[in-house]
C-alpha cells in the first residue's frame, strides 16, 4: 500500500507505507527542533525501553522511529552529563539493514536531535579504518547510523569495544535471524547468563 508524502520541492509524491511515517516526521520538524507530540502508546514504549531491552512490534507508520528518537534524547542527555563529569565518550548506534535506510534514518535523527549524527556504510570504507580513526569518530559524534555489518566487523576487529556503546537500536529487528548481525549482537553481547 502506498501513500502521499512531500518531495524535496514540497510537491506531493507517492511513497510506500514503510517510508510514510519517516516522511511525515521529516516534514513536520525543524532541524534539531524536536518531534511531534508522541501518542500515549509511544510514551509507554519509550518508558519500557528506558528501563530494559525492548523489541517494539508495531504496524508500519505507527511511529517506532519517534520512540527511538525519544529514547535517544534521553540517553544523550545522560551521556552529556557523564562527559561533563569526565567520563569517556560513549556512542549510540542506530543499526539498519540497507544503505537507503542509513540515509533515511540519519536524516530523521539529524532533524530531531541536537547532537552530532554520523552515517556510515560500506562504500565509505569503514571496514578499512583502524582503531584511531574509529576513536576520532566516537569522540566527534554522539550517534552513528550505519549498516549492521559495519558495527559487527568493528567489534570483531577490536576497533570498537562494547563498553564504548551506550545504546543499540536495531531498525527492522525482524531481520535478527540465523547469521544476521542483529542475531550475532544478541547472542554475543546482549544475552547475559
Predicted regions and their residues:
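Conserved pre-motif I regulatory segment
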Residues: 10-57
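Conserved catalytic network of the ASCE P-loop NTPase/AAA+ motor domain
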Residues: 79-88, 110-113, 135-139, 158-163, ...
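Conserved RecA-like helicase motor-core motifs
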Residues: 93, 106, 113-128
